[in-house]
Amino acid sequence: MIIRLKDGSEKEYAQPMSVLDIAKDISEGLARNACAGQVNGETVDLRTVVSEDSDLNILTFNDDEGKLAFRHTASHVLAQAVKRLYPEAKLAIGPAIAEGFYYDFDMAPLTREDLDAIEKEMKKVIKENPPIERYELPREEAIAFMKEKEEPYKVELIEDLPEDATISFYKQGDFTDLCAGPHLISVKPIKAFKLTASSGAYWRGNENNKMLTRIYGTAYTKKADLEERLKYLEEIKLRDHNRLGREMELFTTVDVIGQGLPLLLPKGAKIVQTLQRWIEDLEDNEWGYVRTKTPLMAKSDLYKISGHWDHYKDGMFVLGDEENDKEVLALRPMTCPFQYYCYKNTQKSYRDLPYRMSETSTLFRNEDSGEMHGLTRVRQFTISEGHLIIRPDQTNDELKGCLHLAQYCLGVLGVQDDVTYRLSKWDPNNKEKYLGDDEYWETTQDAIRNILVEQGVPFVEAEGEAAFYGPKIDIQAKNVYGKEDTMITIQLDCAIAENFDMYYIDQNGDKQRPYVIHRTSMGCYERTLAWLIEKYAGKFPTWLCPEQVRVLPISEKFADYAEEVNKELKKNGILSTVDNRSEKIGYKIREARLQKLPYMLVVGAQEQETGKVSVRSRFAGDEGQKDLKDFISAICEEIRTKEIRQEVEQ
């Protein structure tokens, strides 16, 4: 048989060979570092036997698929250790994930001390180096095997597999687990690992199921790489918006109010207000939008017309019972059906289009409680939502305009290089989820694809991520832990106008159906705030800071002058306060620095006599004395231009 390798070279063998044996034939060093293989594009164990002409790639830890095999094996070592220490624990699932692995167990919550004990047991397992064996069982035998081991979650997983599925197991010493693999040949290479956290996780991500205990870990081939990763994890914890946002008193959550319902405290609310006012002025004054204000709820009849009732009802908060109540209401998950009636309020001609509507909308989504997280996954949120009613011939220009507006906003926030673009398409194998036929989806997807290509925007395509009514551009960003969220969407909808009988009068006096573009300039303000907290580690650009200047009198004698300075700052629209406490000036400066304020103005006898202020900033440290008018002029220009100044180490 002929084996074609990744570098284009070929190896010829007279008999079947395992992937590991082929790796050894190529190089002993390659065999030592091998984690798995790819045969004709399929990732397999090193123990897999190749018996015919094939393309082969030997995967090491440097390959993504190699890392997955390495860390998946580590998750089994974790499970083996847990079962030794907690025999009553029930196994759920334990996949490899980006930068690590986790395993879910039905067991009591764990402490850091518990994780340390499990780590110690994992080291014992690795030292024992039990042989790893893969084998398969028929469906009924597999179910009986897991029932005998009293593993109900594994039984459920097997029962849910397709009838023709291959059911494989991995055995290492005294531990056996249901698993598709692939795994390492041996656990011996797993020497640099760490259990990083534990948390609750619902079985299969469904809040109606039992809460399990999830243990997270990471593993590397080299101790130095592990230490670097752990150092990085400590650093990103300092940026985690869910921790830092609370420390900075930007938001909080309260159990009695509920999950996914954060309270924006005065500082956080001020940042969001600044963002909202900026976006509203931008849309209204520079991009030709008209503003609407529509209800937070509507009768179910509206959502039946829009399609939400059939395609999105499970994600909505419904008020009332369809069977018993005469009128059933639902909180709005989006604003589009309301704005359609704003459009329909007066007849429009072809000259009136595009008709661009925008609203700062409060929306409600019935997210699973297991999905709730800080400000990024919430049940009530505010969004810069808008809908453009356009003629078909305006599609290209208006899609480009929406994309340019979104990119401009990202640029002002300084995050344009932190995003990726995705063309979210329908799933042709699950057509009941969507409106429209094959031709509709191919046409609309092509329209969006052409815009992205024409604008030179690098993008990926994702099947099954479209809205039920049309494809979209999703602008994606990752949080500090690498989880991707959608920040901004631009969606093309060529079907909904018929549902709402929307039309315009063309140049011949005939009625024509318009298209609709659903879009946001900023996306969800709460999610944007979370993103900015993590991007800037709480050190926001001055124009976004809820407190831009703090005036610090060096003693009570200069409190009146400090108040005069503060009054002048406020007159010029600067967000400023005075620290009139009797603390020492050094303490006040340190505290202001810890609170990440952009500017401190120190005032004492010299400043009072000359009408000046001593300026300290995050950007240049001690900037010396300045005339108050000059400082005000400079900071007002910085705020007006939304400048992002570089920080200096202090």
Annotate each language-model stretch with its function:
Residues M1-T73, V77-K90, I97-Q650:
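NTP/phosphate- and nucleic-acid-binding module
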